[in-house]
From Swiss-Prot:
Region (Disordered): 436-506
Lineage summary: Bacteria, Bacillati, Bacillota, Bacilli, Bacillales
Comp. bias (Basic residues): 468-480
Protein name as it appears in the record: DEAD-box ATP-dependent RNA helicase CshA
Segments carrying motif Q motif: 2-30
Domain Helicase ATP-binding: 33-203
Amino acid sequence: MQNFKELGISDNTVQSLESMGFKEPTPIQKDSIPYALQGIDILGQAQTGTGKTGAFGIPLIEKVVGKQGVQSLILAPTRELAMQVAEQLREFSRGQGVQVVTVFGGMPIERQIKALKKGPQIVVGTPGRVIDHLNRRTLKTDGIHTLILDEADEMMNMGFIDDMRFIMDKIPAVQRQTMLFSATMPKAIQALVQQFMKSPKIIKTMNNEMSDPQIEEFYTIVKELEKFDTFTNFLDVHQPELAIVFGRTKRRVDELTSALISKGYKAEGLHGDITQAKRLEVLKKFKNDQINILVATDVAARGLDISGVSHVYNFDIPQDTESYTHRIGRTGRAGKEGIAVTFVNPIEMDYIRQIEDANGRKMSALRPPHRKEVLQAREDDIKEKVENWMSKESESRLKRISTELLNEYNDVDLVAALLQELIEANDEVEVQLTFEKPLSRKGRNGKPSGSRNRNSKRGNPKFDSKSKRSKGYSSKKKSTKKFDRKEKSSGGSRPMKGRTFADHQK
């Protein structure tokens, strides 16, 4: 395996890379860096998490060190990805005087104009805000020699294809080296390559997200009215460390987030209407384990690079294979195992088959957890919490109440009653989600058929998960047991069973 120095990287940059823990280049870095240093156009097909930022960022640092003015422009689909790329570039170039500026919407443009006037060597931005600066002439292109399009297919999916053309057309082709990276190569991206790139070197890497055996993929068949309860039952049984939940619409994300919070789960939501300050706050909470469930739309989650995600739940099935690929690619990274579960209405099974055919592998059918499994998981969780609570000092007033109760009731019955209330507390909470119509069946041409997706004049009614619960699941179970007042010693406490987890593959 070649090291970075053997690829032609300077000692200063190698030192920065080693301080970041990067000793050897990843496959895409090894294949891309030599051509990038020569100024050759590069067309890279790679997923997030393969080291593609280093593939274009490391040679870029080598080309701009010691020079002044904007020399490189990097386009990214989202604000989060733009910030992540910029931060990595700053780390790559530590101590070498390279200035990196980010420009994106949701932040004051005046502050960005001020930063651009200082003549940074590298600008990273989203297409819309970059065009704003081009039109204002606050971003000059005459000195730009390198243009990089990161996650080009995502920018296309978000409707930026014309913006990408506009920006590429503004940078003089004679002096421009173009590097385009994309997980997939749809026709629109291929046309962009043909129009604006000069005999690019094509580099492909192993499709980490689609072929990674570390991701176990499942689907579970569930009707819309039963979906939320089935989902929370999976959460109770799986006990995810960090989970990303995908909803199809902003409304779905808002309602699902509120419903989860009301049930006691640590969740936050992300979608396109969330302010930049709120987005940063939510992501910080997720990365710092203050919350463990992130509910998001496809657009809001694009460009996020969060490690440690153990589970991905497609609460709403994605409408195309590419979205599915990007969704499940948030888990199973860095050699860790991941689980992806897709909830599918019976009439949406054509979409599951389409995804399986495109990816060349089958998903495993996963039955919803039984009530017994859910209760066992909740009991295990409560036992662990109680053990943690016992290590903390209780307030004196609570000790007084405890003494009074223990004097009045049998201790085992008292603890059992309290545990039952804790375990079944979620069943008492009512939540409402707007009914979402399932996707249309696929026709013979692979496109939706019939009129299932036509807008109903009556709108989308709301359903109450308490009254419309899954068959066999009670929404409200109150204990009818009356515990006896204490007359005799209980003879000691009853031993609890050890912690067991239901097998998600049963």
